[in-house]
Structure formats: structure tokens, C-alpha cells
A protein has these predicted regions:
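Active-site mouth loops of central-metabolism enzymes
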Residues: 9-17, 86-96, 156
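N-terminal beta1-alpha1-beta2 module of alpha/beta enzyme domains
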Residues: 1-5
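Structural detector of well-ordered beta-strand residues that form the stable sheet scaffold
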Residues: 6, 36-38, 93, 112, ...
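Active-site beta-loop-alpha junctions enriched in small/polar residues
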Residues: 10-12, 40-44, 95-97, 116-118, ...
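An alpha-helical appendage that flanks or caps ligand/catalytic pockets
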Residues: 51, 57-82, 122-180
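Histidine/acidic residue-rich metal-binding segments in metalloenzymes
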Residues: 88, 104-105
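Flexible, glycine-rich active-site loops centered on histidine and acidic residues
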Residues: 13-75, 117-119
Length: 180
């Protein structure tokens, strides 16, 4: 009952905001106070994926307005009531690239950093997180900046064995960047 459940990341450009809100409100109804919603802005890595989602590479970026719409459905301030209604609320985390950090700061939301943002130079990484903290606009729900760091870790008896554990994931990542 103490373990939180959540999405590693719902890529918001691939979904309607009302549907995302209702899916997570249903999870919240089943597991009250234990659900987290991570929202990202990726549109799909390959052209076949973008076509399957019916989104062109040149589609307008609606992430900020869609994120705000999801937030309004979750807090009950939207013109439409997302069902089931929740009393406890579902916290939103922005899956952050450098742009995502700026959006999260403006909206007063927590961030999850990992992957690309952690791959940039250490000075840039520190600068990006410092800028998020400086630009953060406090809200009632989030009075101060909140950063979650996501790292891949492989634990084994030796370095070689740990590297071997990462091979399937590396292969899957390479394959998905090629085929979607």
C-alpha cells in the first residue's frame, strides 16, 4: 500500500488529454493516493510511427496547452468533468528535456530527468536544472521545485556481466529507433 504506481511516460502528443485524464483517474479510483502521471512531449521517433499516430513531423506543438488541459481535468477546473472524479488528485510529472524543464518551471510542476538530459555535458546538465529551480513558479500543490532522476543501473557480479544484462535493452532501443 506504500508503493506508488505510475507511468514512466505518456507521450501526450499521441493521446487526447481527456482520455489520458480519465485513464489515470480510473487508476486513482482503484489505488487512491498512489498514482503518478508522467507526461512527455515526444511525437514518435520514426516516420512510420508518426504516420500510425496520424501526426506529421510538422504538426503544431500543442504540448503546453494539452498539458494544461490534462491538469484542469485532473483538478476539476475544466468545462468537462473527467470521470471518475477524484478527491485526492493525480500528481503530474513532466518528463524533461531542456524544453520540458522550462515548461515545468512555468507551470510549477515536478520533473523527471533521465536519458537525453543526463547525456549532455555535466556543466549544461547542472545549468539546465539550476534554471528550472530559478524559474520555478510555486503553486499550492508544488510550493518548491521537485526533481526525480531516472537512471539505468545494472547490478551483477562483474562489470562484464552487468554490461551483458544491458544488451537486450540496447538492442531494443536501436531497433525501435530504426523501425518504431
Amino acid at each position: 500500500r506504500d508503493i506508488r504506481l505510475g507511468s514512466g511516460g505518456v507521450m501526450l502528443p499521441n493521446h487526447q488529454p481527456l482520455i489520458v485524464a480519465e485513464q489515470f483517474l480510473m487508476l486513482e479510483a482503484l489505488y487512491p493516493g498512489r498514482i503518478d502521471l508522467g507526461l512527455g512531449r515526444s511525437l514518435g521517433f520514426t516516420e512510420p510511427v508518426r504516420q500510425a499516430l496520424r501526426r506529421s513531423k510538422d504538426a503544431p506543438d500543442t504540448f503546453v496547452s494539452d498539458l494544461d488541459e490534462v491538469r484542469r481535468y485532473l483538478d476539476g477546473s475544466a468545462a468537462v468533468t473527467a470521470r471518475p472524479a477524484s478527491q485526492s488528485g493525480v500528481p503530474i510529472f513532466v518528463l524533461a528535456t531542456r524544453t520540458g524543464l522550462k515548461v515545468a518551471a512555468q507551470l510549477g510542476l515536478p520533473v523527471v530527468v533521465g536519458g537525453p538530459i543526463l547525456g549532455i555535458g555535466s556543466t549544461d546538465r547542472v545549468e539546465a536544472l539550476d534554471e528550472y529551480r530559478r524559474a520555478f513558479r510555486a503553486t499550492d500543490a508544488h510550493p518548491e521545485p521537485y526533481v526525480v532522476v531516472s537512471l539505468e543501473v545494472a547490478v551483477a557480479d562483474s562489470t562484464d556481466a552487468a554490461r551483458e544484462l544491458l544488451i537486450p535493452e540496447a538492442y531494443a532501443l536501436a531497433e525501435s529507433s530504426r523501425t518504431g
